[in-house]
């Protein structure tokens, strides 16, 4: 069984795209998805963790780390292992950042690796995806709609490759990617325009 842990993503569409892109590589009965929240059913999650052969965490990265909810969850899992729980699954991660370079997720990836080491869980492989805001902010511009589509196509192959590692339960080198169809300068320019637009909207509301 493959357990997908939803650690939260900037855009629901991105989250669905990532899981759906990998889903075709697993039989439906193998795949269980659980969202990490403060109110999640811990007993059920423990059963999933014990039964899973592979665990895939998908999450956003904020200031070099995953969210506090995800960190709290990992700490709780670590304590459960210390308390006698056994997790034989291989751990994989797909981390998103709105910054251009996927390498910006590398520190958060190390946090997850350290968690696996402390919890005696085998690390499988990490995929860090940069430029995560591009598609969802494409707006009405035909140019940016096209660029958004190109980014989806760009991510797709890497997500499917990650799914193959998960399916075969093998380890690999972490991979960090970004939308090469758009330059870093152009991406930052667009992000700055979005921030200014949001600020103007907030001022207008006040």
Labelled PLM ranges:
Residues 1-29:
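N-terminal beta1-alpha1 ligand-phosphate binding loop
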Residues 20-21, 127-206:
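Glycine-rich phosphate/pyrophosphate-binding loop and the adjoining helix
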Residues 20-30, 113-122:
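Short helix-loop-beta junction
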Residues 12, 40-119:
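Helix-loop-strand module that forms the ligand-binding subsite of alpha/beta enzymes
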Residues 3-5, 32, 56, 92-94, ...:
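Hydrophobic/aromatic beta-strand patches that form the interior of the parallel beta-sheet core
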Residues 17-19, 69-77, 105-110, 148-162:
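Well-ordered, non-membrane alpha-helical segments in soluble/globular domains
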Residues 5, 28-42:
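A short beta-strand-loop structural module common to alpha/beta enzyme folds
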Residues 66-70, 118-119, 124, 157-167:
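Extended, charge-rich low-complexity interaction segments
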């Amino acid at each position: 069984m493959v357990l997908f842990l939803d650690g939260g993503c900037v855009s629901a569409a991105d989250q669905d795209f990532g899981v759906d892109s990998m889903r075709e590589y697993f039989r439906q009965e193998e795949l269980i998805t659980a969202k990490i929240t403060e109110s999640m059913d811990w007993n059920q999650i423990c059963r999933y963790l014990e039964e899973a052969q592979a665990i895939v965490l998908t999450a956003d990265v904020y200031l070099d780390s995953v969210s506090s909810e995800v960190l709290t969850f990992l700490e709780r899992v670590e304590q459960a292992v210390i308390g006698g729980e056994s997790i034989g699954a291989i751990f994989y991660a797909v981390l998103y950042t709105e910054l251009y370079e996927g390498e910006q997720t590398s520190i958060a990836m190390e946090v997850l690796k350290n968690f696996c080491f402390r919890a005696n869980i085998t690390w499988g492989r990490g995929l860090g995806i940069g430029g995560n805001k591009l598609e969802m902010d494409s707006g009405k511009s035909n140019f940016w709609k096209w660029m958004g589509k190109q980014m989806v196509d760009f991510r797709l192959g890497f997500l499917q490759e990650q799914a193959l590692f998960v399916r075969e339960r093998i380890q690999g080198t972490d991979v960090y990617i970004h939308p090469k169809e758009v330059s870093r300068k152009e991406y930052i320019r667009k992000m700055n325009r979005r921030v200014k637009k949001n600020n103007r909207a907030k001022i207008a509301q006040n």
